[in-house]
Amino acid sequence: MNRLRRTMIAGLALAALTATSAFAGQAGDGTKRLAIQISDNDPATFNKALNVATNFARGMSETGDFYEIEIVTFNAGLHMLRTDTSPVMDRIASISESIPEVKFSACGNTIAGMTKKEGAAPPITEHAGVVTAGVVRLMELDDQGYFIIRP
């Protein structure tokens, strides 16, 4: 009897997991949602993330699908949004102006840590918003149905 019960519970858990996976990245309104995690100070990663965002946006536009993209930076990845250290600032400005569905988020905890270490707040692009914590933001986005990737 216990074996049957365990098998049934495992089956239900698998069914729930499969159903959840099938809808990841898509909201109930049909909007496709993509979050991109940037936590390393690597120009190649910055460019890959921007390529993914623009390619996803192009694909969604071609099919007529509604979409939202959020690029979340924290730890060393915050350098992507720093006006004094980012090698991709021109691309960020261009994407922000041409693809309004792309949003950039900077981790407030990382900003506070850099401020303490450097003696002044790091200059963050005007195209980014500040969130309390990058990891918490990714968890919130996951709860909202975003598909999260790390290039």
Regions found by a protein language model. Name each.
Residues 3-9:
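N-terminal export leaders
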Residues 23-151:
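Secreted/extracellular ectodomain signature
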